[in-house]
Amino acid sequence: MPDRGGENGASCSVGRWSAEEARAIYNLPFNDLLFRAHGLHRENFDPNRIQLSKLLNIKTGGCPEDCGYCSQSASAENGLKASKLMEIETVLEEARKAKAAGATRYCMGAAWRSPKDRDMPALTHMIESVKAMGLETCMTLGMLDSDKAEKLADAGLDYYNHNIDTSERFYPAVITTRSFEDRLDTLANVRNAGIKVCSGGILGLGEEAEDRIDMLVTLANLPEPPESVPINMLIPMPGTRLAKAAPVDPLEFVRVVALARILMPKSHVRLTAGRTAMSDEMQALCFFAGANSLFMGDTLLTAANPGDDRDSSLLRRLGIQAETEQPA
């Protein structure tokens, strides 16, 4: 295995990971894998600090995409009614609450294939107003062309989330209305506009371990790896094609977190959806393996989230404190 720099094998900006290298790391004995991941985590971050984000659904339901996991897809049979774009003042009031609760980043998500021209003035106003509160901004709005990415960048958007979800091989089994290449094109447009990239995937879609590894290799081998890598555990939502998906083995999930930390040592790795089904012990292992960001609050889009009380209790017991300043 080629040298990646650093005594624990930190990846650098030059050089690329092969699937074979990543697979060999993923298949290490569990303790060896976590030892390596935690060493890299300590080299690049304070292991007792965590970045807190708040996610708000600013436009719910009615998305024309057929993502098999998503309750907001128009193809989901769950009776979810599509909403209009949320009023700007409502978005800002929720941002004030998020900051008061300790969030340093405010993420705004809309169930669209891509934003329309008519929505751009409201979106840029949201970005500018949230930034004026001293919060980092993130949006996830579907696909972006270069023009819309530039407009969001001009408004000061810090991060754009667009997950690749899974491996290129397995992707067509989950989504048919948007190609894997479409997702990579959006990430390129975001990066070229000067916006930081947030991109990760979902475990529990029916994929194999190879798909999880390949997904992370794809992200690590982008011209610049994402600054933020969300790792989701599928929440089977009623009415979706994956409503009866089998649960993910907790230790396999921790392995993916550890591999993400090793392949992308300078990125924030975020525990995202599915934490309500994770034990405190499982989350603690994820933090040890390199996860250092999470979403706070009781809901994530249309799904449940552990809530601030449970999170505060867990972090206090682990001696982990929230980042008080925006990460560089």
From Swiss-Prot:
[2Fe-2S] cluster binds at C107, C138, C198, R270. PROSITE patterns: RADICAL_SAM. Pfam families: BATS, Radical_SAM. GO terms for molecular function: 2 iron, 2 sulfur cluster binding; 4 iron, 4 sulfur cluster binding; biotin synthase activity; iron ion binding. [4Fe-4S] cluster binds at C63, C67, C70. One of its GO terms (biological process) is biotin biosynthetic process. It catalyses: (4R,5S)-dethiobiotin + (sulfur carrier)-SH + 2 reduced [2Fe-2S]-[ferredoxin] + 2 S-adenosyl-L-methionine = (sulfur carrier)-H + biotin + 2 5'-deoxyadenosine + 2 L-methionine + 2 oxidized [2Fe-2S]-[ferredoxin]. It comes from the Bacteria. Residues 48-275 form the Radical SAM core domain. Its cofactor is [4Fe-4S] cluster; [2Fe-2S] cluster. Pathway: Cofactor biosynthesis; biotin biosynthesis; biotin from 7,8-diaminononanoate: step 2/2. Its EC number is 2.8.1.6. Binds 1 [4Fe-4S] cluster. The cluster is coordinated with 3 cysteines and an exchangeable S-adenosyl-L-methionine. Binds 1 [2Fe-2S] cluster. The cluster is coordinated with 3 cysteines and 1 arginine. Catalyzes the conversion of dethiobiotin (DTB) to biotin by the insertion of a sulfur atom into dethiobiotin via a radical-based mechanism. Homodimer. Belongs to the radical SAM superfamily. Biotin synthase family. This is Biotin synthase. It comes from Brucella canis (strain ATCC 23365 / NCTC 10854 / RM-666).
